[in-house]
């Protein structure tokens, strides 16, 4: 029984102790605002209440049991007898009250820092404003420079001859190299227009960049912009100078071209006058000539008769070249399917006259550079590839192994005045014949030297048994003309 009574008493004491602790801690949790201002720990709170921290804790424990008030030490003022002002009850067992933050001198320091920062921001804004004004002035100067350069470019473009600006594609001639310059001029104009468009886009972007510069603190932007503007100005000036040089070159080239055109027109007018005063009917049928007044790739004559397979041939004709010393071109060419150079008589540039058979070449010692009428005959046989060349009835050269044992293929196209790169076409102006052709005849055998001399002297005229020179068999194209002409009567008058 005593043991049970002791256990019961101990339990009650433990229960009372727990209740006292709970009651002592309730004011701290319920009223945190009662903490002393500026207190940061238990010792400072206890000293502000006028009692040491440990004694306050003990008195809190004793207050639940009705203990007496605080004792008065000798020598203390009487006022200390009175209870201290209400403050937070501290507990060393549960928690420590935290005092509310109170204003300190840091607030005054923060206010001074804000004022300094405001002054710094104002100073920075003023610097940015000055930078923006300087940039705007530079932009205006750049804009004036761009307008001035654009005006110069417009004056250069407007100063070009309209004929050069509107020059379109034309037919190929020996002077085609000079007419390639307008294409280069158009390319330069396109490049200048592209630069002008870029400059206009930059002008449109400049106001927006000027507005943004007031808020952007980077002075490198104007530097990059100015460097780009300087680069564009340099490119534009280079283009303008190149355009002026090209204009001067084109003016010189156009003057020369104009002289050549006038010369060609005079030649054409002479042909027209010759046709107007000539006979309208050819008598006999072979008394005509084919005239090609200028070197080009579109004037020629075509023989309207098929050529059979040949194992030998003789081609004779009267020629008068008007090309001077720049090469006589191609008096005639015969092409077949699969071989454009089946038979070609050609003189290109400063090279001697050549005879091509199946792309095999033999050089002929003939000369037509004096602008006079000459009688030319070429004879060839497939056996051993023997060939002979006659000028004005005289044998000038001979040889062998020219396309030996190769028969001339049939069903080809024979062209007077042009060299064929394909069957019946794709002429090259640099290889064209300029002058007059008459009495072109083709035989299927080699003529004797006596027969050739008789034809050249007009003492024994012969008509080709494969291709005779007849008006109905020869058709002119591209401006080539047929006119009345009798070479034997001309020689008789001379």
UniProtKB/Swiss-Prot annotation:
It is found in: Membrane. Residues 24-494 are extracellular. Its cofactor is Ca(2+). PROSITE patterns: PTX_2. Residues 286-488 form the Pentraxin (PTX) domain. Disulfide bonds join 316-377. Glycans are attached at residues 42, 211, 457. InterPro entries: ConA-like_dom_sf (IPR013320), Neuronal_Pentraxin_Related (IPR051360), Pentraxin-related (IPR001759). Binds 2 calcium ions per subunit. PANTHER family: NEURONAL PENTRAXIN RECEPTOR (PTHR19277:SF94), PENTRAXIN (PTHR19277). This is Neuronal pentraxin receptor. It comes from Rattus norvegicus (Rat).
